[in-house]
Amino acid sequence: MSGPVFVITGGSRGIGEAVALGAARQGYFVVLTYASNAERAASVVERIHASGGNAVAVQADTAEEADIQRVFTEADRHGRLGVLVYNSGVTGQHSTLIDADTSTIDRVLDVNLRGAILCGREAARRLSTRTGGAGGAIVFISSRAAFYGSPGEFVWYAASKGGMDSLTNGLARELGAEGVRVNAVSPGPIVTEMHRPGKLEVGAKRSPMQRAGTPDEVAATVLFLASSEASYVTGANLVVSGGL
């Protein structure tokens, strides 16, 4: 018998994949979203099923409200929502702001911030004791870029993550008395497909630990925040960056 439903957006690779696998091991019914790679998402679901867990994959563009509604409708089919982890994120092409095109900026803000807000709203509607929910947890995957600003690379991405940090803080205060904890995790250089060639190595050398992190190390932090072990933790932003 599966436990509560665990929604993880961007759950087909990297940090999202590690979170999905870990949540399934903890007994959650996992609803993971993917943008376009159905084969990769199916592979994650198959691994969960092979280990005795339960999961489904849903194609969704989290910049689209209709897709978000469809994800949560699917989650409702499988039981009571317990956790949302918003992991969807894009950077756009690297450049200075002077050279950036508006379509890139719009896309990054729509996926990284607007999508987080809309998914947070849908989760809150289901989790809040004020609306009949049983409480639960929301975890937003932010970035150390929000602190450093990513000059010369993608300041718009950093700004979108800064907005996510504000969302975390405000929503934690808004939902604190309604049984919902809201936190964020800010990864530093992590071994994922998001980084352009050479970028990860540069970040690893800057880290006091002299290495990049792994998706599993980030996932462990996410799963802690989603668990009862973090029952008195809300409004926090845990940095997983090797000291950066």
Q: How would you name each of these model-derived features?
A:
Residues S12-G14:
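Conserved glycine-rich cofactor-binding loop
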Residues S95-L97, D101-L109, G203:
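Substrate-binding pocket helix/loop in short-chain dehydrogenase/reductase
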Residues R125, R173-A177, S231:
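Alpha-helical segment proximal to the catalytic Tyr-Lys
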Residues S143:
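Residue(s) in the substrate-gating loop at a strand-loop-helix junction
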Residues Q26-S43:
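Conserved glycine-rich Rossmann-like NAD(P)H-binding loop of the short-chain dehydrogenase/reductase
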Residues G120, S160, T168:
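Active-site helix of classical SDR
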Residues T214-V240:
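C-terminal substrate-recognition "lid" of short-chain dehydrogenase/reductases
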